[in-house]
Amino acid sequence: MDPFSQLSQLQHNLQAMTKTVAGLENDMLEVLKENTELKVENQLLREKISKLDANKEPAENKSQAGLKSLRNIYDSGYHICNMYYGSHRESGEDCMFCLDILDNFVNHGQKSRG
């Protein structure tokens, strides 16, 4: 096989591999998206179960539990804001919308105590 044919064959193989990698990347993104949605849904269902089990808790404990749940979701790397709820945050990246929600939640709880 001459060098040109070898180069042509190599280029064809590279294009096929590029398509395969792109397909795998798309599949991985879909799996990650579904995983995120399931984690958020799971967390929401756990919160609903907690609410059903603990209807007699004082309001302050409920709000603290809600804040803790939101904080856990956010700390796990997911958005809790209306704009991006449930989507994955980049590592080390903070979202001002999510942080605003957490800040308002904390400040609202402090005002109701005072």
Curated annotation (Swiss-Prot):
Involved in control of chromosome replication initiation. Inhibits the cooperative binding of DnaA to the oriC region, thus negatively regulating initiation of chromosome replication. Inhibits the ability of DnaA-ATP to form a helix on DNA; does not disassemble preformed DnaA-DNA helices. Decreases the residence time of DnaA on the chromosome at its binding sites (oriC, replication forks and promoter-binding sites). Tethers DnaA to the replication machinery via the DNA polymerase beta sliding clamp subunit (dnaN). Keywords: Cytoplasm, DNA replication, DNA replication inhibitor, Metal-binding, Zinc. This is Replication initiation control protein YabA. Belongs to the YabA family. It is found in: Cytoplasm, Nucleoid. GO terms for biological process: DNA replication. Homotetramer. Interacts with both DnaA and DnaN, acting as a bridge between these two proteins. Its cofactor is Zn(2+). InterPro entries: YabA. One of its GO terms (cellular component) is nucleoid. Binds 1 zinc ion per subunit. Zn(2+) binds at H79, C81, C95, C98. The gene is yabA. The keyword Zinc applies.
